């Protein structure tokens, strides 16, 4: 069962070009966790469904999946630094934030969650998020960390604050983790992330 402010997985969304993702502009922020590999499937499915997907990556994320992978899957440039495309007349982070229909941060590590909640904007993911009006554009966070990190009081405080600030937290799953333990904190599967994103887009429609 989802807690208030959380998003529970729902039924699989329609992913054809006439479905909920068609012609939608989706920002996907990838941060430094092993679950980043799952986001490849999410980006591929969104692109196949007709979405315009822009992938943002923290420096740590590029250690798990290369930017060229997401570029190939999305068919669009991938941003790994706030200093890319500075020749544009429209500041990159403002432009991406203003035109997005939804944003998904996956995996959202313990560190990234803390930095989002405390207003940091020093990498391309947090910078773009800082410019999104969450009253108009849904921003989903998919936490991914081991069980001990998930249950830290600081993490639970940050989750509560994130929900209070209008972020939609996708409840993590329980299961086998990369640290060779079983517990809560496992990032949901791509189908669950897509379902949560589809539900958020449906809720956000006028």
Question: What is the predicted role of each segment?
Answer:
Residues 1-141, 147-206:
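A cross-family phosphate/adenosyl-ligand binding-site feature
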